[in-house]
Structures are given as C-alpha cells and as structure tokens.
Amino acid sequence: MIFCKINIWYNSLRDTQIYSYVICVLLCKLRTEKWNVKFYQREDTIMDANMKKRNELLAKTVIKGLESRNMSGYYAQDKEAALKQALELIPNGSTIAMGGCMSAHEIGLVKALQDGDYNYIDRAKLEPREGLMAAYDADFFLSSANAVTDDGVLVNIDGNSNRVSCIAQGPKKVIFIVGINKVCPDLDSAMKRARNVAATANAQRFDIKTPCKETGKCFNCKSPDTICCQFLITRYSRHTDRIHVILVNDTIGY
C-alpha cells in the first residue's frame, strides 16, 4: 500500500515536472518571437528614421544648389506638407495652368485648386492651342521635374513641348513638385533618368506606338509617336522668384 502511494505520488510529480517544462519552453519561445518582432520593428523604425534624415540632408544640398541658380527651394517632409507649402505660394484668385504633372495630383494640389478660390485652367476642356496660350499668360504653372541634380539643375523631357516651353518662359511663376526619388548625382544620370525612367513610365499613359511602350525600355527611337522630342535643362533662372521647387520626402511622380 505504501509502495503504491509512493508510486502514484512519483508519477504525479513527474507529470507536473513535464507539464512545467513544456510551459517553460512555450513561454520562452513566445518571448523570443515577441522580442524578435520588437527587434525587427525597432530595426525598421531606425532604418526609416535614417532614410528620412538622409533625404532631408540631401534636400538641403539640392536647395543650396537651387539658390545658387537663382531658384527657390523648399523641403516638405511628406505629401501633406508639400500641399501646404504649395498653397502658401499661390494667392487666392490666381490663374493656374499645368502640364502633365502626376506629382501635383498625388499630393492633392490639383483638387485643392479646383475646389478653392482659384482660376484653375483645365486644359482637357480646351483646344490644345487655346490651352497653351492660356498657360503662357497664367500667374502660376505647375510642373514636376523628370530629374534634378543634387546641385540644383532641373531636367525635363517632352513630346509636344507645351510643358517645357512654359517652364522656360511665359507664366509669371513656375512651381515644381518633385519627389526625392528624382534627385540624381549629376547631369548625365539625370538625363538618363528622364529617358529610361520618366519617359518610359509616361509612355504607358498615352495611346502611342513606341518601343518603350511595349518593352518598358528606352531604345532611343525616332518613332513618330516618341515623347522624347525636346530636352530642357534649367541650370539658372534669370528672373528672381520665378521658379520654386518643392522637394517632397516621398516617392512620387515618374
């Protein structure tokens, strides 16, 4: 009888020990996984903070270059800040025209102008020539840059050339909305970006027949439908306070 009680007690203790061991293993595994999640989340947060800081420093470098070229530069930490900065530059009642600027749409600027106290020229409702003439006489012209060098040179490529012509002359002021993704180390890489990234992406928007539309790669073509007709390199603005560039710490536009 005593032996049986001891045996039952021993088996019960053994089961309890096994149960406790299993619980400890599970808790350790859970804690490890939880710590790993926290570690990776912390790592991602650090990486995001590092990239944000890098982009901010890069933007300051670009802005310094723009200012040396008689152009004004602004840093926006996100799309909302970019929208606020753009609206601060445009007084109520202003006449605004625009080329094909996806970045202005992405930050909500086009909708804000359409809904606000502004005279927004919708070129889609006008004949091409009429829209171009209206843009030349506008108070503000909205655009993005296909690329910008880190020392402040703006690079744009165009098909019909209405956009690059308005950047060069005509509208009283030009506001560029430029994602930090478009900053390049030099003019050569900026021109390559305009051809190989911006133009090949923009080609997808149009009903055209070009090699880049079919393959996504630039072939330096002379197709009748090519949208790479005119390069505009803006290295200096003769007119003070005409060109304003808002650099957005985000990947926007083509």
Cite the ranges covered by each PLM segment.
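Conserved phosphate- and dinucleotide-binding cores of soluble alpha/beta proteins
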Residues: 136-254
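Low-complexity, intrinsically disordered or signal/transmembrane-proximal segments
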Residues: 10, 17-21, 40-41
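Acidic/polar hotspots within intrinsically disordered regions
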Residues: 21-24, 36
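N-terminal active-site beta-alpha-beta segment that forms phosphate/nucleotide-binding
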Residues: 55-142
